[in-house]
């Protein structure tokens, strides 16, 4: 975040990011949209699919430590402040200590941040159970 021409640290940026999320949620709700916030996976410090290709017999080398709870709390804070439902998907990607590159038979991330289509499909049933019923 830039404030008055200065680039703020990650920690100093957090209140501004939350305020921006709250404003966005309220703008979306003003249109009549039903809004749900989803906290997603930690950003991988490597490209997991490339790492898996190089370490197919040593997949643990491709795992990484998840972001701290505080780093990941921005979306949940914004949801709490607006009273909307928040879904924490982090447990679908990582344990408390480690984010594996492969879960089941699927590579989780295609790059540092985006899920593979294959792993996304494995989440469909879980996700449908998380979403509130959106009646007419």
Residue ranges and their predicted role:
Residues 1-136:
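Extracellular glycan-modifying ectodomains
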């Amino acid at each position: 975040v830039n404030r008055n021409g200065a680039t703020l640290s990650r920690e100093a940026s957090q209140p501004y990011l939350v305020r921006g999320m709250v404003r966005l949620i309220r703008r979306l709700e003003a249109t009549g949209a039903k809004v749900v916030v989803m906290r997603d996976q930690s950003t991988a410090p490597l490209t997991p699919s490339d790492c898996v290709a190089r370490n197919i017999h040593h997949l643990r080398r491709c795992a990484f430590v998840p972001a701290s709870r505080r780093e990941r709390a921005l979306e949940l804070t914004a949801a709490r402040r607006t009273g909307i439902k928040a879904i924490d998907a982090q447990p679908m990607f990582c344990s408390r200590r480690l984010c594996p590159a492969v879960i089941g038979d699927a590579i989780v991330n295609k790059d540092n941040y985006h899920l593979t289509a294959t792993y996304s499909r494995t989440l469909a049933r879980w996700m449908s159970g998380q979403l509130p019923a959106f009646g007419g």
